[in-house]
Structure formats: C-alpha cells, structure tokens
Amino acid sequence: DEYPIEGHTLYDNVLRLWALRLDNKLFEDEERQRQAERIKEKIRINFWPTPSNIDHPAIYHQRGFTDSAESDLQHLACAISPKGYDTHFDTAGHAMAMLLGLVSKKQYDQILNYLKPIFRHVGTVLIPALWPVITSDDPEWTSLKHNYSYTFKNYPHQYHNGGIWPVWMGWFALGASVNGNTHLPETVLKAWMKLEDVEDVNFSEYIASDTLQHCGKERLCYSASGLIFLVASIRKNAFDKLKLITNTY
C-alpha cells in the first residue's frame, strides 16, 4: 500500500499458499494439494536464501539468491524482483509464513533475535510493519516519495515506513503462538496497552515508531482485530483453533 515493494512478494505468496490449502480442504482437490506443496517448497527456499541451498533447482533468481545468501539474512525476504532481493522485514508476511508452518524452529529463533535490536530502537516491544525505515538518505527514498495516490503518508517511522500496525502485531503474535511462544504475545500486549487507555482503547490505524503516538484513522475494526488476535495467541487452546483455520499440519 503505497510502499515500493515489487515483484514476487512474500505476503502475496503465503496468501496464495493459504488459499490453495483451504481450497484443497474444502474440495479435496489432489492437484491443488500437490500445487500447494510445490509452492510451499519454493517459498521456503527462495525467500530465505542460504549457502546450503545455493544450487537448489527451485531457485527463481540465481544472482539475487546468491548475493542474499552471502549476506547471512536472518529472516525471510520481503520480495524478489528482476533487480534482486528486497530484504526489508515484512511483519505481515512473516506472520502468515509462521502460521502456515513455513519456518523451522531455528529460523523462528533467528527471527526473534533479529527483532531484538528493533525493540531497542523503538524503545518498547512493538513490531513495525516494515523495517528498516527508509529515510531521505536511502536510495529507496525516491521510489517511496513518489508512490502515493492522494497525499504522501510514508514519512520515516510512519504509515508502512516503520509504522506499528496493531493488526499485523496481532497476526505475528498468532504466528508466535503456533511456534509455542506465548511470552512474546504477552509482552507485546502489555507494551501496547501502556500506550492506551485500557477502558477506551484508541484502535488507531498505526503507531509512529519514533514518538509512539497514535496516527491515522481511529476506531478501526481491523486494528481491534489485532487485540483479539493477541489475546487469542496467549490462550492455551489457540494452537488447536489455528490448525483448523490454516490447515497447516
């Protein structure tokens, strides 16, 4: 949404995989099941380049894969295009990937370690939608500043450019709970509620990651869903419910 992500995006690919799994679950379509397995393998290989997979036949962009594998990427890539890999951290894409069982335990631990310096930078345990922030000193700034329909919103630390979206934090918490981690969702929930009047939660569109001020529109249902997801991720039976939703296992 007005952010310069192009090519094969992590978010779109995991949504497609989820749709195929649900299609197979509903219609018992064996071809869809095989297609889903092929796509699952391609996502796991291509979006987390490693030296051990450098000759894997499923690689889509060999040069970009090799370059990113040598950089020791600690999380899933955001997108793959003819230019190479976009290695911004995409919270929404990671949330869906974790929910669908696309990351190993080792990779999950790497993702959490990657988030720790982000939490220190932000000053609290809240997860920006995309990271790192693009500033006017970065080469991506030119693409970002012209990429809007009516008014420019992606100032540093705002909107998708480092803004903290409750809905995506909720989804990420669900992904963490599927991996057996309820501590992170609990910590995120407490950090978020410190910024809110718990008797009258703002449910703003996003929170600026530099000032921790509520921004954008308020009283949004999808921001409220983030709170629902966070609470569900802490409950002990959330994992069984999610298995039914995602058809992961």
Model-assigned labels for residue ranges:
Residues 1-2, 77-80, 148-157:
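Short glycine/proline-rich turn/loop motifs
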Residues 5-9, 15-136, 194-224, 231:
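Catalytic cores of carbohydrate-active enzymes
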Residues 117-121, 139-142, 150, 154, ...:
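Non-catalytic C-terminal accessory modules of carbohydrate-active enzymes
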